[in-house]
Every structure is written in structure tokens, then in C-alpha cells.
Amino acid sequence: MFRRYRVSVIIHRSVTRGCYRGWSEGKIDVTTTYDKNHWENVNVWTFDVVCLTRLGVQCRQFDPVSGPFSMNNERKNEGSVYSVGSQNHLVPIRSRKTFFKKKSQISNLLLIILFVLVGALSITVMILAVLYGCKNMMKICDSEDCVRIAASLKESMNESVNPCDDFYQYACGRWPQEHPIPDSSLTNSWFSERSNRMYRKIRDLLMVNISASEVPWAVMQAKTLFTSCMDVYTVNELNLSPMFDLLKLLNLPMIPLVTKKTTNYIEQLASVKKILDLDIFFGFEVIPDPKNKSKNILYLHLPIRSNPFLTDKELEKRLQTIRSRLRKLDELDDEVMLSENEDAELIYMVDVIKYIINNGSDNKCSSDNESIFEDEVLKDFVKEIYNISNLFYDMTRADQNQSISVESLSDSDYMLVDDLQKLTDDYVIDSNLSLTPTPIWRPFIEFIFEGIDKLDLDNKDKVLIGNLEYLKDVALLLACFEEEALGIYVWWTVVDIVVPHASEKLRDIWNKYVSKVTDVEVVGESKSLFCGSIVNKLMGMAVSWMFVDPTFHENKVNKVQEMLEDIREAFGSLVAKTDWMDQLTKTATLKKSHKMEYEIGFPTWLFNEEKLNEYYEGIDLSETRYLANMVQIVQVQLIKTWTSLHDENIFNESYWATDPTDVNAFHTFQLNHITIPAGILQFPFYELGLEALNYGAIGTVLGHELTHGFDTSGRLYDGDGNLRQWWTNKTILEYSDRTQCFIDHYNTYYEVDDYIDGELTLGENIADNGGLREAIVAYKRWKARHGHEPLLPGFTQFTHEQLLFLSFAHLWCESYTATSLKWMMEDSHCPGHVRLQAVLRNSKEFSTAWNCPAGSTMNPSKKCRLW
């Protein structure tokens, strides 16, 4: 005989304001089984909890035996049954009286246990209601921004990967499938995709017909530059005439060894710098004095290899890297690569020079040019240019780590040009008595400032020497070569930067060469995109007038400012908790952080027509003179630099480190200044629907830039932007010990055929690690003020902290080839997948948020940390 007891308990659940209010009925069915002769096994207590909910709330299951509360299981229609079993052996009953007495005692005991369990379960349910009821009823964000980022995150992820094994593959494993590498590139990333999108929009804006009455004069000048670039017919008709006009302006021959020599190579060097801002054998600038940024000073240093006209920054950087690597291949003993790339460059040089000698036609040269046109003579001519280039590349590389720093900068680094000349002359003579030193520094500087500003090189106007040993080596090499050979090298350097902007024939020669050495197909590049990029590079502020929404500051700036202030305060709290900085250094560091200024979006004067026009004052562009237009813009901007030598520097909102269209962010050490252009304040960096996602994306970028102020270079500048020692020696030593951890950590990452250079990338790695930590702390500050956010559609099982890390990872998703990885190894930034993995492995907060076991791939025992 069996008897069944049923106890029904009604549980009232009340949830605090902000969640739903309702009733939930729980039924607890307890069945006890026995026969009338003796107890068998009392082995089942069954709890059937049925949640009757309102508003479509999903029930969450709690196992009273094992305890965990499941937030990830799907809702089931059937009841959830949990059992507690007992296998106790009971003694048979000997008498009816004893039987009923025993039965009564057991029943009472069971009732007591039942009520205890019911009470415990009731309390548990109520606690869970309080703890998780709000989350269950949290609003799901259904805005366009939330849906967009949720879809992008989802399509990028490979959820079959364990996030604690490889978070990059987990977050970005499918990104390359959805974002293939364009034919014109070796890589793809969010940064390059957004930049290309920006260029297309700029191109479209420039192609719209507008009248002078509708826009500022500066914008019409930008339209004129675009029109001249697009006018292929006129460019081809003019052929080499614009190039020859430029060579004449620079005091360079149209054709070396044929044109009669009229000037020395020092004047040619100075002309090229004065008009095109092109460094050849050494670098020269007017800069704020590192010890006192309120005044400017002349600065001699290693050459900065850049092209004033080239549009694609990544292509320019890669080409310089390739040429530098090519000249290192002798050391690497890679004869095949050396031969292939050297041949490609030599063929390019020969083809260009032949075309120029032939005056841009297929006709045979005149008898005057016959000797140089012969192949053997031309090859020797080209080889000499190539050899000079090799020597200066080698020399630059050998001395690149010897530039001035706070530890070495002294009053002796400021000297008069004649004193510098004596030092370099003595070095040349000591090296080889048969050599005659060449006067370099005074004639070079005086020629640049001729007709611009009056100098006092005898007393007042000293020169800051960035690398004395390099300048000595320059003087020695210049003394070793014939003036004619040096003049030819200067001539070729100018021709090389003009080729992509000359006739279609020369541009085809250029494209063929670039495609060969970079493995990038550039032949089919859109002419309109090319021209739009040119205009953006040379007249970025005028282009920004068309691109930027005037209401941008009203809609976005306040939120970005709030985020920046959160990050600044987060950095301050992290510094305050450090145990390796002494109090004096902490105070100075916090002071610098609070003095750090930032500009967001675009300059406040951008939509002031008078100031915008003043920014480009001095140019007068023509729709039929494309090359001359570019030269004119560069020259006008340079004149402003040269004339600023004796001006007092007043840095205010007019200063901008870049154009508003740039998809990047910048830190200027000497100004203690961060620039956040409008170009980067777009998907997937910003406006992601939830602040957890925004802090994980643009927040980490802002933290990165702030931390640059305290990396291995930034820490040398105080809060006013002056170069001096403002940390104590003890703190500097502690800092060096901790940064060594980062060097060692990044040195372990192997890519293609080499390891990451932890020293080369140290500054960026410090900024990456600090930026993430600051964004995490900053988001906590934001949440403390604003409360919990809605859930992300498709990601309701994720905490907001997890979403922050997903957003951070999403930022660094990329597509790349083995060849492109080789070029990345030369950069001060690690490849995106290394940046992500290395930073997260150093993050305790990441391991906690994702429950990564100690010792797992993403949670190693040793972590590097500064703040």
C-alpha cells in the first residue's frame, strides 16, 4: 500500500523598483513511499518548481544539490526535477503499536525537515529574485547602433574557440572571411577600412558641383586642386614640362651630365629642403626648444624619409621599409631576395631616366645625349645613385638610436654653426688627411632663410644638434664623393617623388615597380580616389569643412570629454596605488596628467570662414597645373615654419596635430596634448550603443594616448612639455626594471620568420597595456554614476565587463599575409593580433571577467604592469 502526501506552498516574490512586479507560484510535491510490513528505502524527495511568470520572463534554474545558478541554459517547457536520495537501512517493525508510534515520529520528523527545506527554498528563491530578477528584466538595447555592433561582433567571432585559449581567434576568427584584403593592399583592418571609406566620401564631396558663393575660398581651392589632378588629358599634354619647371626652381639640371652645371650641391640640398621639405643627407627643422617650448630653435638631426606628395601613408611607410630592408640584405645573406628587389629598383630607375632623357617620347635621343643614353653608361650612372643611397641608409640605421634624450641633452648640444663646422672638419681630416672638408652648415642654413628671415648665426641663433656623430659621418661621406655624383643623387631624389604625379607613362612605370617590390596590385587604382587622397593630404582642413558635421561638437564632444575625464581620473587612481613610485614622482606625474590638454573632433575655428581662408593664405591654384599646385601648397606651409624661428610660441586651440579626417589619434609630447580627430569617432571605434562597448573601443584608444605621456619617450617631458628630468633617480630605476618585463614578454612572440622586437615596440606596448587598464577603471566610474546599462541583443549571456573586452578585441581584428607580417616587424607597433593577445595576457581583469583558469594560455602566472 502506498500513500502520497502533497504540500503546496505559495511564494510571493516582490522585486525592487526598476524590475517587474508579479506573483510566482511554486508547488513542492513531496512523495514518501513505504509498504505496511517494513520500510523500504525512503529514497525520493522531489521538488517540482514551476515558475509562472509575467511579461515573458524566462525562469532560471537553481539546483539545490549542486548549487550553481545557470544563466546560460535555454528555457525548457517541462518541469525541472531535483532529487535528494537516502539509502539508509531501517529496522523492521515488531508490533502494531510500535509501528504506529514509529510512523508518527517519522511523519513528524519528515514534516519538520520538509518545512525547513521549504523555508530554505523560499529564502533562496527570494534572494535569487533580488539578485537576478533585475537582470532577467533588464531592457535589451534595440537601437540601430546596438544592433549594428552586435551583428559585427557576431560575424567576426569564432565561438568554437575557447576564449581562455586564444581570445584573438575567439573574437576575430571569422573577421578575415568577412573583410578580405583588397587587391591594392597586403593587409586589412578596421583602421584601413574606415580610412578608405573616408577617402570615398571625400572623393564624392569633391566631385559635387559647387559655386564660389556657396563655400569658403579655401574650399574652392581644394576643389581646384582636385580638378587639376583629375585632368589626365592636360597632365599628359604637358608631359615632362611641369617636372622640368620644378627642377629649375630647385636649381637642379633637367638631365644630369648633359645640362651645364650652375650651382653646387649644398645650394641644391637647401633648395630641396626650403621648397619641398625633403631631407636627403641630413634632417633640418625649426622646432620648439625642448628645454623651453615658448621659443623656437634650429635643429639638425638624422634625415626623416618622407614624401610630401604621396597619398597612401601605409604604402609610403612600406616602401621605405622595403628599401631599408633591401639595403640590409647584404647582412642577411639572402642573395635571391637581394637580386630580385635590387633588379626591380634598378630597372625602375633606368626606365624613368630613359624616359626623361628621351623627353617623354619614343623618339631616339639627339646626338648630344647619345653617350649617356647608351645602356652601359646609364647602368653605371644608376648604380652610382644606388650605391650612395646604400651608404646613407646604412649610416642612418647605425646612428638612429643615438639621438638626444633627457639623459644626454646638455648645453653643449646647443652650438654655433661655425663651431659645428670645425668639429666636422676636424673629424674629416683625422679620418683621412688627403680629404678636403666641405663647408656645409652655414651655407645650407643661410640659403634656406635667404629672403625669409634675418639670422644671427654668429651669436644669437644657435643650432641644436640631434646626433653629432651622425653629422660627422655625413661630413666625411660628402668629402669622399665628387660634387657631380652628389648632385646626381639630389636630382634623382626629387625625380623619384614626382614620378607618381607626372604623365600616365611615368605613373605606369611607378605602379609596375611598386607592385613588384610590395606584392600589392596598384595598377588598377581609382584615379578619383587617388586625387581625393592627394587633396586630403595637402588641404585637409578645407576638406574637413565639407566632411565634418557642424553640429558634431553639440552631439558628441561632451560624451567624449566625459570619457576622457574618466580615463584621466582612472590613471590618477592607478598611479596613486603604485608601490614603486615615490611620493615626489607620484605628485609630479598626477600634475602632468591634470595639465594634459585635448582637442576633440575639429578645431573650433574650422567653420570660421575668415580663419579657414587665412590658414591657406598665399596659395593661388590653377585647374591646369597639377604638379605646380602641390609644390605651391607645400612651399607656402614651409614658409610659415621658417618665419616662425624668432616668434614666441603660443599654443592654443588653433594647434592641431593632424587633420580632422584622420582615422587615428595623437599625443604631442612637447605640448602635453592629445588630438582626437572626428575621423576616428565613428563605427567601430565609437557610437556603439553601450558605454561598455565605447569604453572598450575608443576608451582604450584615449587611454593609449594619455599613457604615451608616460611611456619611455613621454616621461622625459614634464607637464609643460619641456625636456628635463622631473622623476627621481630611484623611480627611474624602478620604471626601467618594470619596462624590461614588457620587453621580455613581447620578445617571445614569433611571427613568420622572426620574433617581435620588444625594445622597438616598447613605447606602444606600454601605451596599449596602460590604455586598457585605464578604460576598465574608467567604465566602472561611469557605471557608478549612471547605473547598469541594457543588454546587447544576441549577447544577453555576457556581462558588460565581458563586452568591454570583446569590443577591445574587435578593434584589432585584421587580415594579413605572410609578406605583410614581415613589413610589420619593422614597425614600432606590433601586429594587431599580437597587440591584443599580449595586452590581455597581462590583464588580471580580463582573466577574472572570462573565468580563465590560472596557468591557461590567456592567464599566465607572470604578468607585466606599470600602473
Per-range role (PLM):
Residues 112-139:
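Alpha-helical transmembrane segments in eukaryotic/viral proteins
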Residues 366, 375, 385, 406, ...:
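Intrinsically disordered, low-complexity linker/terminal regions across diverse proteins
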Residues 85-120:
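Helix-loop boundary elements of multi-pass alpha-helical membrane proteins
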Residues 20, 47, 52-55:
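Intrinsic disorder
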Residues 145-146, 162-165, 170-236:
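Active-site-surrounding "flap" and adjacent substrate/cofactor-binding loops of secreted or lumenal enzymes
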Residues 201-566, 620-626, 633:
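Noncatalytic, helix-rich "gating/capping" subdomain that lines the substrate-entry/channel surface
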Residues 129-155:
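Short, Gly/Pro- and small/polar-rich lid/capping loops
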